[in-house]
From Swiss-Prot:
The keyword Zinc-finger does not apply. It comes from Tolumonas auensis (strain DSM 9187 / NBRC 110442 / TA 4). Zn(2+) binds at H143, H147, E224. The gene is htpX. This is Protease HtpX. It is an enzyme of class 3 (hydrolase). Its EC number is 3.4.24.-. One of its GO terms (biological process) is proteolysis. Its main location: membrane. The chain crosses the membrane at residues 4-24, 37-57, 158-178, 198-218.
């Protein structure tokens, strides 16, 4: 979930910034976006722009946010094992060798990110490396490699771009309706009305952006099942089931809720509707039913 939450947070921030830029351009250069055709076009440009920028920044943001130390040259036995395992799995799936990194965390987590399946980043926590068996860790790595091979981040970007477009479009339309309803020609200047329109549209974008994230989360859950299946094909489903069962036994004692939502595991107080990963028991059941 770490890569998804980081992507969504970056996307929301970028989208809000781009929306502010759009409003400034509209005010200073007289660019009208209130017509349905022009508004939809601008919503698409800024909506997809936000998700694409988030994708391009994903590796940099992940490294910076979690202090990922990229393995340039393995220096220990465990680093050699990690590097060689990722290299072997990358060759098996036909992708370019990803950057391999480790970040310091007691939580048993891993994530993959990057704008290109041939230039991705696969990072694992120190907690995973030192608390899982080699077979379990190998299955986790195969899960992340499957995400890269399946192009999940690019597909997520396209879906997020569509969602952003409709969020911006609907927010601006509703903001126009509300601001016109609230406006009094006798009491309010056009400048004040423009400020009200801008403020209302920002509120709507924030609210609808959070609600629309359920669509992205649903997509993410489906891709998790697929990545689990990909891992099972690479290393065997018994290893992947063992890794998930290890997470089920260990994740209750990990970090607080804000951190436990990350990685391939994650306990969260939110309902499944807002979860990027299916419950562990459902993932295990799906693997057991694989033929």
């Amino acid at each position: 979930m770490k890569r998804v939450l980081l992507f969504l947070a970056t996307n929301l921030a970028v989208m809000l910034v781009l929306s502010i830029v759009l409003s400034v351009l509209s005010s200073f250069f007289g660019i009208s976006t209130r017509g349905s055709g022009g508004l939809l076009l601008m919503a698409a440009v800024f909506g997809f722009g936000g998700s694409i920028i988030s994708l391009l920044m994903s590796k940099w943001m992940a490294k910076r946010s979690y202090g990922v130390q990229v393995i340039e040259q393995p220096r220990s036995e465990i680093e050699y094992w990690l590097f060689n395992t990722v290299q072997r799995q990358a060759q098996q799936t036909g992708i370019g060798m990803p950057e391999v990194g480790i970040y310091d965390s007691p939580d048993m987590n891993a994530f993959a990110t990057g704008a290109n399946r041939n230039k991705a980043l696969v990072a694992v926590s120190s907690g995973l490396l030192y608390n899982m068996s080699r077979d379990e860790a190998e299955a986790v790595l195969a899960h992340e490699i499957s995400h890269v091979a399946n192009g999940d981040m690019v597909t997520l970007t396209l879906i997020q771009g569509v969602v952003n477009t409709f969020v911006i479009y609907i927010s601006r339309v509703l903001a126009g309706i509300v601001s016109n309803f609230m406006r009094s020609d006798d009491e309010e200047s056009s400048a004040t009305g423009g400020i009200a329109y801008f403020a209302i549209s920002m509120v709507f974008e924030l609210i609808f952006g959070i609600l629309a994230s359920t669509i992205v989360m649903w997509f993410s859950r489906q891709r998790e099942f697929r990545a689990d299946a990909g891992s099972a094909k690479l290393v065997g489903k018994d290893k992947m089931i063992a890794a998930l069962e290890r997470l089920a036994r260990g994740h209750d004692s990990q970090l607080d809720g804000s951190m436990m939502a990350f990685g391939i595991n994650g306990k969260t107080a939110m309902t499944e509707l807002f979860m990027s990963h299916p419950p562990l028991e459902k993932r295990i059941q799906a693997l057991r039913e694989m033929r």
